[in-house]
Protein backbone atom coordinates (compact mmCIF):
# COMPACT_ATOMS: atom_id res chain seq x y z
CA UNK A 1 0.00 0.00 0.00
CA UNK A 2 2.85 2.37 0.88
CA UNK A 3 4.47 1.57 -2.45
CA UNK A 4 1.26 2.48 -4.28
CA UNK A 5 0.94 5.76 -2.38
CA UNK A 6 4.58 6.64 -3.09
CA UNK A 7 4.13 5.90 -6.79
CA UNK A 8 0.95 7.98 -6.88
CA UNK A 9 2.66 10.87 -5.10
CA UNK A 10 5.59 10.80 -7.52
CA UNK A 11 3.19 10.68 -10.47
CA UNK A 12 1.19 13.65 -9.21
CA UNK A 13 4.40 15.58 -8.53
CA UNK A 14 5.75 14.81 -12.01
CA UNK A 15 2.44 15.72 -13.64
CA UNK A 16 2.31 19.03 -11.76
CA UNK A 17 5.87 19.95 -12.71
CA UNK A 18 5.17 19.04 -16.32
CA UNK A 19 2.40 21.64 -16.34
CA UNK A 20 4.78 24.42 -15.28
CA UNK A 21 6.11 26.55 -18.14
CA UNK A 22 9.89 26.52 -18.40
CA UNK A 23 11.03 30.14 -18.13
CA UNK A 24 14.84 30.27 -17.71
CA UNK A 25 15.13 34.06 -17.88
CA UNK A 26 14.61 35.46 -14.36
CA UNK A 27 13.52 38.86 -15.60
CA UNK A 28 10.94 37.31 -17.92
CA UNK A 29 9.56 35.21 -15.10
CA UNK A 30 9.42 38.17 -12.72
CA UNK A 31 7.61 40.21 -15.36
CA UNK A 32 5.01 37.47 -15.67
CA UNK A 33 4.61 37.06 -11.92
CA UNK A 34 4.10 40.80 -11.52
CA UNK A 35 1.99 41.27 -14.62
CA UNK A 36 -1.19 43.32 -14.59
CA UNK A 37 -3.66 41.78 -15.09
CA UNK A 38 -2.53 38.84 -12.98
CA UNK A 39 -1.22 35.77 -14.79
CA UNK A 40 -0.17 33.67 -11.77
CA UNK A 41 -3.76 33.27 -10.65
CA UNK A 42 -3.08 30.51 -8.09
CA UNK A 43 -0.24 32.49 -6.52
CA UNK A 44 2.25 29.63 -6.41
CA UNK A 45 5.11 31.63 -7.92
CA UNK A 46 5.06 29.58 -11.12
CA UNK A 47 3.30 29.90 -14.45
CA UNK A 48 1.24 26.86 -15.32
CA UNK A 49 0.38 26.03 -18.92
CA UNK A 50 -3.28 26.48 -18.00
CA UNK A 51 -2.52 30.01 -16.77
CA UNK A 52 -0.52 30.85 -19.89
CA UNK A 53 -3.35 29.82 -22.19
CA UNK A 54 -5.67 32.29 -20.46
CA UNK A 55 -3.48 35.27 -21.41
CA UNK A 56 -4.44 37.37 -24.42
CA UNK A 57 -2.39 40.54 -23.96
CA UNK A 58 1.22 40.48 -22.73
CA UNK A 59 3.14 43.63 -21.82
CA UNK A 60 6.88 43.03 -21.37
CA UNK A 61 8.10 46.53 -22.14
CA UNK A 62 11.57 47.43 -20.79
CA UNK A 63 12.08 44.46 -18.43
CA UNK A 64 15.73 43.65 -19.24
CA UNK A 65 14.70 40.33 -20.73
CA UNK A 66 17.34 38.49 -22.76
CA UNK A 67 15.47 35.23 -23.40
CA UNK A 68 11.76 34.76 -24.06
CA UNK A 69 11.83 30.97 -23.86
CA UNK A 70 8.41 30.05 -22.52
CA UNK A 71 6.50 32.43 -24.77
CA UNK A 72 5.47 29.39 -26.83
CA UNK A 73 3.08 28.38 -24.03
CA UNK A 74 1.07 31.58 -24.50
CA UNK A 75 -0.73 30.21 -27.52
CA UNK A 76 -3.73 32.54 -27.29
CA UNK A 77 -2.03 35.92 -27.05
CA UNK A 78 -3.05 38.38 -29.74
CA UNK A 79 -1.03 41.32 -28.39
CA UNK A 80 2.67 41.11 -27.45
CA UNK A 81 4.80 44.10 -26.52
CA UNK A 82 8.42 43.26 -25.72
CA UNK A 83 10.01 46.55 -26.71
CA UNK A 84 13.27 47.76 -25.24
CA UNK A 85 14.73 44.52 -23.96
CA UNK A 86 17.92 42.55 -24.67
CA UNK A 87 16.52 39.95 -27.04
CA UNK A 88 18.90 38.38 -29.55
CA UNK A 89 16.36 35.86 -30.84
CA UNK A 90 12.64 35.31 -30.58
CA UNK A 91 10.42 32.38 -31.52
CA UNK A 92 6.78 33.33 -32.02
CA UNK A 93 5.94 30.39 -34.27
CA UNK A 94 3.47 29.01 -31.71
CA UNK A 95 1.75 32.34 -31.17
CA UNK A 96 -0.39 32.05 -34.26
CA UNK A 97 -3.14 34.36 -32.97
CA UNK A 98 -0.90 37.42 -32.77
CA UNK A 99 -2.37 40.53 -34.36
CA UNK A 100 0.01 42.99 -32.68
CA UNK A 101 3.74 42.39 -32.22
CA UNK A 102 6.24 45.00 -31.05
CA UNK A 103 9.85 43.81 -30.72
CA UNK A 104 11.49 47.16 -31.37
CA UNK A 105 14.63 48.34 -29.57
CA UNK A 106 16.18 44.92 -29.08
CA UNK A 107 19.23 43.11 -30.51
CA UNK A 108 17.49 40.79 -32.94
CA UNK A 109 19.49 39.62 -35.95
CA UNK A 110 16.61 37.56 -37.33
CA UNK A 111 12.85 37.39 -36.93
CA UNK A 112 10.48 34.77 -38.32
CA UNK A 113 6.86 35.88 -38.57
CA UNK A 114 5.82 33.48 -41.32
CA UNK A 115 3.59 31.59 -38.89
CA UNK A 116 1.73 34.71 -37.77
CA UNK A 117 -0.78 35.35 -40.58
CA UNK A 118 -3.15 37.36 -38.37
CA UNK A 119 -0.66 40.17 -37.75
CA UNK A 120 -2.08 43.60 -38.53
CA UNK A 121 0.65 45.60 -36.79
CA UNK A 122 4.35 44.70 -36.70
CA UNK A 123 7.10 46.82 -35.17
CA UNK A 124 10.62 45.41 -35.40
CA UNK A 125 12.44 48.74 -35.60
CA UNK A 126 15.81 49.43 -34.01
CA UNK A 127 17.25 45.94 -34.26
CA UNK A 128 19.97 44.35 -36.40
CA UNK A 129 17.84 42.57 -38.97
CA UNK A 130 19.38 41.91 -42.39
CA UNK A 131 16.39 40.08 -43.88
CA UNK A 132 12.68 39.88 -43.13
CA UNK A 133 9.95 37.82 -44.77
CA UNK A 134 6.44 39.28 -44.51
CA UNK A 135 4.95 37.32 -47.40
CA UNK A 136 2.62 35.40 -45.07
CA UNK A 137 1.41 38.48 -43.22
CA UNK A 138 -1.34 39.34 -45.66
CA UNK A 139 -3.36 41.25 -43.04
CA UNK A 140 -0.53 43.64 -42.18
CA UNK A 141 -1.68 47.26 -42.02
CA UNK A 142 1.05 49.00 -40.02
CA UNK A 143 4.70 48.02 -40.49
CA UNK A 144 7.70 49.57 -38.72
CA UNK A 145 11.09 48.14 -39.69
CA UNK A 146 13.23 51.26 -39.56
CA UNK A 147 16.81 51.42 -38.27
CA UNK A 148 17.88 47.91 -39.20
CA UNK A 149 20.36 46.54 -41.75
CA UNK A 150 17.88 45.57 -44.44
CA UNK A 151 19.15 45.63 -48.02
CA UNK A 152 15.90 44.46 -49.60
CA UNK A 153 12.27 44.15 -48.60
CA UNK A 154 9.33 42.57 -50.40
CA UNK A 155 5.94 43.96 -49.36
CA UNK A 156 4.07 42.84 -52.46
CA UNK A 157 1.87 40.47 -50.43
CA UNK A 158 1.00 43.12 -47.86
CA UNK A 159 -1.76 44.68 -49.92
CA UNK A 160 -3.61 46.10 -46.89
CA UNK A 161 -0.61 48.13 -45.77
CA UNK A 162 -1.50 51.67 -44.63
CA UNK A 163 1.60 52.84 -42.78
CA UNK A 164 5.08 51.76 -43.87
CA UNK A 165 8.19 52.97 -42.06
CA UNK A 166 11.37 51.50 -43.55
CA UNK A 167 13.77 54.40 -43.09
CA UNK A 168 17.40 54.14 -41.98
CA UNK A 169 18.19 50.87 -43.69
CA UNK A 170 20.31 49.98 -46.72
CA UNK A 171 17.56 49.53 -49.28
CA UNK A 172 18.58 50.02 -52.91
CA UNK A 173 15.10 49.45 -54.33
CA UNK A 174 11.54 49.47 -53.06
CA UNK A 175 8.41 48.23 -54.82
CA UNK A 176 5.15 49.56 -53.38
CA UNK A 177 3.07 49.07 -56.51
CA UNK A 178 0.86 46.46 -54.80
CA UNK A 179 0.24 48.60 -51.73
CA UNK A 180 -2.68 50.59 -53.07
CA UNK A 181 -3.95 51.43 -49.57
CA UNK A 182 -0.69 53.05 -48.54
CA UNK A 183 -1.14 56.40 -46.78
CA UNK A 184 2.21 56.97 -45.05
CA UNK A 185 5.58 56.05 -46.55
CA UNK A 186 8.76 56.93 -44.67
CA UNK A 187 11.76 55.62 -46.60
CA UNK A 188 14.41 58.22 -45.87
CA UNK A 189 18.11 57.47 -45.34
CA UNK A 190 18.44 54.52 -47.66
CA UNK A 191 20.16 54.07 -51.03
CA UNK A 192 17.12 54.40 -53.27
CA UNK A 193 17.48 55.84 -56.77
CA UNK A 194 13.87 55.66 -57.94
CA UNK A 195 10.40 54.63 -56.83
CA UNK A 196 7.10 54.08 -58.63
CA UNK A 197 4.22 55.72 -56.76
CA UNK A 198 1.72 55.47 -59.61
CA UNK A 199 -0.51 52.97 -57.78
CA UNK A 200 -0.50 54.75 -54.42
CA UNK A 201 -3.35 57.17 -54.99
CA UNK A 202 -4.18 57.29 -51.25
CA UNK A 203 -0.70 58.42 -50.25
CA UNK A 204 -0.81 61.35 -47.82
CA UNK A 205 2.75 61.57 -46.51
CA UNK A 206 6.02 60.60 -48.16
CA UNK A 207 9.53 61.08 -46.83
CA UNK A 208 12.34 59.94 -49.12
CA UNK A 209 15.03 62.32 -47.88
CA UNK A 210 18.70 61.33 -47.92
CA UNK A 211 18.59 58.94 -50.84
CA UNK A 212 19.93 59.15 -54.39
CA UNK A 213 16.89 60.25 -56.37
CA UNK A 214 17.36 62.28 -59.55
CA UNK A 215 13.63 62.40 -60.33
CA UNK A 216 10.33 61.87 -58.55
CA UNK A 217 6.87 61.45 -60.06
CA UNK A 218 4.03 62.27 -57.67
CA UNK A 219 1.45 63.12 -60.32
CA UNK A 220 -0.77 60.21 -59.25
CA UNK A 221 -0.78 61.17 -55.56
CA UNK A 222 -3.42 63.93 -55.31
CA UNK A 223 -3.98 63.45 -51.57
CA UNK A 224 -0.42 64.32 -50.54
CA UNK A 225 -0.18 66.69 -47.59
CA UNK A 226 3.45 66.14 -46.56
CA UNK A 227 6.35 65.80 -49.00
CA UNK A 228 10.02 65.51 -48.05
CA UNK A 229 12.56 64.85 -50.78
CA UNK A 230 15.41 66.77 -49.17
CA UNK A 231 19.07 65.83 -49.68
CA UNK A 232 18.76 64.10 -53.03
CA UNK A 233 19.80 65.03 -56.57
CA UNK A 234 16.58 66.41 -58.04
CA UNK A 235 16.91 69.24 -60.56
CA UNK A 236 13.15 69.61 -60.97
CA UNK A 237 9.88 68.41 -59.49
CA UNK A 238 6.29 68.73 -60.67
CA UNK A 239 3.85 69.23 -57.80
CA UNK A 240 0.98 70.63 -59.88
CA UNK A 241 -1.27 67.65 -59.07
CA UNK A 242 -0.80 67.99 -55.31
CA UNK A 243 -2.91 71.01 -54.30
CA UNK A 244 -3.39 69.87 -50.70
CA UNK A 245 0.27 70.00 -49.71
CA UNK A 246 0.80 71.48 -46.25
CA UNK A 247 4.55 70.93 -46.07
CA UNK A 248 7.24 70.74 -48.74
CA UNK A 249 10.78 69.93 -47.69
CA UNK A 250 13.11 69.92 -50.67
CA UNK A 251 16.32 71.41 -49.36
CA UNK A 252 19.78 70.30 -50.52
CA UNK A 253 18.92 69.35 -54.08
CA UNK A 254 19.64 70.96 -57.45
CA UNK A 255 16.28 72.61 -58.09
CA UNK A 256 16.35 75.51 -60.53
CA UNK A 257 12.62 76.13 -60.22
CA UNK A 258 9.67 75.15 -58.05
CA UNK A 259 6.07 76.18 -58.74
CA UNK A 260 3.90 76.43 -55.63
CA UNK A 261 1.22 78.60 -57.21
CA UNK A 262 -1.68 76.19 -56.65
CA UNK A 263 -0.89 75.47 -53.01
CA UNK A 264 -3.50 77.52 -51.07
CA UNK A 265 -3.00 75.61 -47.80
CA UNK A 266 0.80 75.37 -47.88
CA UNK A 267 2.24 76.14 -44.44
CA UNK A 268 5.89 75.12 -44.69
CA UNK A 269 8.30 75.50 -47.61
CA UNK A 270 11.92 74.50 -47.08
CA UNK A 271 13.96 74.77 -50.28
CA UNK A 272 17.29 76.08 -49.04
CA UNK A 273 20.46 74.76 -50.66
CA UNK A 274 19.29 74.60 -54.28
CA UNK A 275 19.85 76.56 -57.54
CA UNK A 276 16.72 78.71 -57.37
CA UNK A 277 16.97 82.17 -58.92
CA UNK A 278 13.45 83.15 -57.87
CA UNK A 279 10.57 81.91 -55.78
CA UNK A 280 6.94 83.06 -55.89
CA UNK A 281 4.92 82.56 -52.70
CA UNK A 282 2.27 85.17 -53.46
CA UNK A 283 -0.45 82.51 -53.72
CA UNK A 284 0.36 80.81 -50.43
CA UNK A 285 -1.64 82.81 -47.87
CA UNK A 286 -1.29 80.14 -45.17
CA UNK A 287 2.51 80.03 -45.30
CA UNK A 288 4.08 80.00 -41.83
CA UNK A 289 7.70 78.94 -42.46
CA UNK A 290 9.85 79.81 -45.49
CA UNK A 291 13.46 78.67 -45.80
CA UNK A 292 15.08 79.60 -49.10
CA UNK A 293 18.66 80.39 -48.11
CA UNK A 294 21.73 79.28 -50.06
CA UNK A 295 20.10 80.00 -53.41
CA UNK A 296 20.99 82.68 -56.01
CA UNK A 297 17.71 84.51 -55.33
CA UNK A 298 17.92 88.27 -55.90
CA UNK A 299 14.53 89.37 -54.56
CA UNK A 300 11.85 88.04 -52.25
CA UNK A 301 8.23 89.18 -51.86
CA UNK A 302 6.34 87.93 -48.80
CA UNK A 303 3.74 90.69 -48.67
CA UNK A 304 0.90 88.20 -49.22
CA UNK A 305 2.04 85.87 -46.46
CA UNK A 306 0.56 87.67 -43.48
CA UNK A 307 0.71 84.56 -41.29
CA UNK A 308 4.45 84.12 -41.77
CA UNK A 309 6.28 83.40 -38.50
CA UNK A 310 9.73 82.38 -39.71
CA UNK A 311 11.85 83.19 -42.75
CA UNK A 312 15.43 82.27 -43.65
CA UNK A 313 17.17 83.67 -46.74
CA UNK A 314 20.84 83.70 -45.75
CA UNK A 315 23.51 83.32 -48.44
CA UNK A 316 21.26 84.66 -51.19
CA UNK A 317 21.47 87.79 -53.35
CA UNK A 318 18.61 89.48 -51.50
CA UNK A 319 19.80 92.89 -50.35
CA UNK A 320 16.53 94.15 -48.88
CA UNK A 321 13.11 92.77 -48.04
CA UNK A 322 9.83 94.34 -46.95
CA UNK A 323 8.44 92.63 -43.86
CA UNK A 324 5.90 95.28 -42.95
CA UNK A 325 2.99 93.01 -43.83
CA UNK A 326 4.19 90.14 -41.65
CA UNK A 327 3.13 91.05 -38.09
CA UNK A 328 3.53 87.51 -36.72
CA UNK A 329 7.21 87.16 -37.64
CA UNK A 330 9.29 85.94 -34.73
CA UNK A 331 12.29 84.54 -36.58
CA UNK A 332 14.26 86.16 -39.39
CA UNK A 333 17.61 84.91 -40.67
CA UNK A 334 18.93 86.88 -43.63
CA UNK A 335 22.14 88.06 -45.23
CA UNK A 336 24.70 89.82 -43.08
List the predicted regions and their residue ranges.
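Canonical leucine-rich repeat
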Residues: 68-71, 90, 111, 132, ...
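Intrinsically disordered, low-complexity repeat tracts
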Residues: 93-94, 99, 110, 120, ...
Amino acid sequence: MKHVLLTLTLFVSFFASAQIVNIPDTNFKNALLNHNPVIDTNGDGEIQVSEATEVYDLNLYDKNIADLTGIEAFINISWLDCRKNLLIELDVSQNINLTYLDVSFNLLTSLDVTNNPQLTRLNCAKNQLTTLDTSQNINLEVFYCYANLLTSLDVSQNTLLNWFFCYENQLTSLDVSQNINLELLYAFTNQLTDIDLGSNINLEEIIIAQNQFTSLDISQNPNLTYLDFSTNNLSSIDISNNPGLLSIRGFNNQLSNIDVSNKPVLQQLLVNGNDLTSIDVSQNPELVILNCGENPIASLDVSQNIGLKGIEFSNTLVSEIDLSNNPLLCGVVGNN
